[in-house]
Each structure stands twice: as structure tokens, then as C-alpha cells.
Amino acid sequence: EVVNNLVKDSDYVINFAAESHVDRSISDPEIFIKSNVLGTQVLLNAAKEYGVEKYVQISTDEVYGTLGETGYFTETTPLQPNSPYSASKASADLVVRAYYETFNLPVNITRCSNNYGPYQFPEKLIPLMISNALEDKKLPIYGDGKNIRDWLHVYDHCTAIDLVLHDGKLGEVYNIGGHNERQNIQIVKLILEALGKDESLIEFVDDRLGHDRRYAIDSTKIRENLGWEPKYTFETGIKETIQWYLDNQDWMDQVKSGEYQEYYKKMYLK
């Protein structure tokens, strides 16, 4: 009923709502199925009922699984999710596709690479490393730290979504990637250098279950068909992001209070 009341007077639905942290999905898969799959179905029903102009599903490159040392995910790469989180997102994508094919609901799906930027919660790599470094805490790095991610600034992600919303061809999937591949350990060392902290803070911990080795997105389709180009280089974006967290430590402290402390102890202080 709450969702219906929100959707009935809306022109568009853009579904950002999700449980999104892989670590949490390993410890509690059920909430990911409920939120990410069943929650999507509730939104789709409301969008169908009230005839929205378009429904856009915000998804992730993790639905494709993992890559070797070369190659990129394209929109036609088979879905091979390896974690409860990515499985829930892949399932939701398929439900969205079914509503397009069955009910002619006007939809698009976007699949992005790893986001970074202001207001990201400290369970994610970049804000977690910044936060711990500022407090001279150990920086926990899974495995050998050489897992590779393709980093996309949140501003560039939003401009891409706006293009898909207004110009995307109905029923199509669009990959959104920053073409900024970095090993996790490279990111951590960069943050330490920017903050003037010693690399002795780095602590390698047991690797995460089902940890995908490499993600990298081919965003040719959205670039050529919709004219999207990212504004941020990684060098500029990470510098601005670090400064944002330095300037907004009160926000970070508030976010880290309460339940987050229990989560951190469970994940990293075993």
C-alpha cells in the first residue's frame, strides 16, 4: 500500500533500493532475497498498475560473475552470479525483463561497475579505508589484495542513468563503467599516501567466500548509442572523494555509530 501510494502519482520509477553489500549477503542471504527480488516485484506491480512512463532497474556488473586477466563484460555476457547478493540482483533483473516481455512494461536495466564518491557508507572499500586510516586503525584487506575492480564516480553513474531514463531504448540493458581498473591494494596504498599514513596499517585478512577476482565493463553501447562520457578521471575523483570525507567526519561518525560497530566487529575483529 505504501509503495502504491508513492508510485501512483509518479511518472518514472528508478529502483535504487537494495541490500547491496556482498559481505552482509554471506552472513544473511534471506534479507537480500526479500529486499532485492521480492521488493523489485512489488515495485514492478505498482509501476504496471499505475502506468508509469518508464521503470529503470539499477543493477550491477556482479551479475556477470568474474573475469580472468583479460576481457570485459558486455550486455550479452551470460549471467553467472557467485554471491547471494549478485544472485539476488540477477534474479531481479530477470523479473524486470519478464515484466517487459509479458506485460509490455516500459523498462531499462543498467549495470554499473564499483561506485565511489561522497556519502558512501563505510562498509564499502574506499570509505572504510579512509575512515580507518584517519583513526590509525588497521586496514583489513581480503586475500592478497589483488582483486581488480573498475571504479565509477557516482556523478558519472547518475548522468548515465539520466540518459537511459530519457533516451534508452525500451527493454534494453546498458552497462556503465568507468574504465578505471585498479587492484584493491593499489587503492589502499593511494589512500594512505594521500592521508600521510604508513603502509604498516595494512592488514591482510582471510579472503571472502566466493570473492570474484576481476570486474571490468565494456560501456561501448551507452557511449555510442546515447552519447555518454564520464567526466571524472579516477585520479581527480579519488582526490575529491578523500577530501570530502576529511571535510565531513561528523557525518561519518554518525553513520558509524550503533549497528555499524557490531557489523565491523563481526566482519573484521574475529
Residue positions per predicted region:
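N-terminal Rossmann-like NAD(P)+-binding domain of SDR-like oxidoreductases, especially those catalyzing
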Residues: 1-115, 240, 245-248, 254-270
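Short, glycine/charged-enriched secondary-structure capping and boundary segments
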Residues: 7, 27-31, 69-73, 122-130, ...
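Conserved active-site region of classical short-chain dehydrogenase/reductase
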Residues: 37-45, 123, 155-158, 162
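Gly/Ser/Thr-rich beta-alpha loop segments that engage phosphate groups in nucleotides
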Residues: 41, 67, 88, 119, ...
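The catalytic Tyr-centered alpha-helix of NAD(P)H-dependent dehydrogenases
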Residues: 81-88, 118, 122-126, 150-154
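Conserved donor sugar-nucleotide recognition element shared by glycan-biosynthetic enzymes
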Residues: 84, 92, 122, 184, ...
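Hydrophobic alpha-helix immediately C-terminal to the catalytic Tyr-X-X-X-Lys motif of short-chain
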Residues: 91, 95, 99, 129, ...
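C-terminal substrate-binding subdomain of Rossmann-fold SDR/epimerase-dehydratase oxidoreductases
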Residues: 127, 133-270
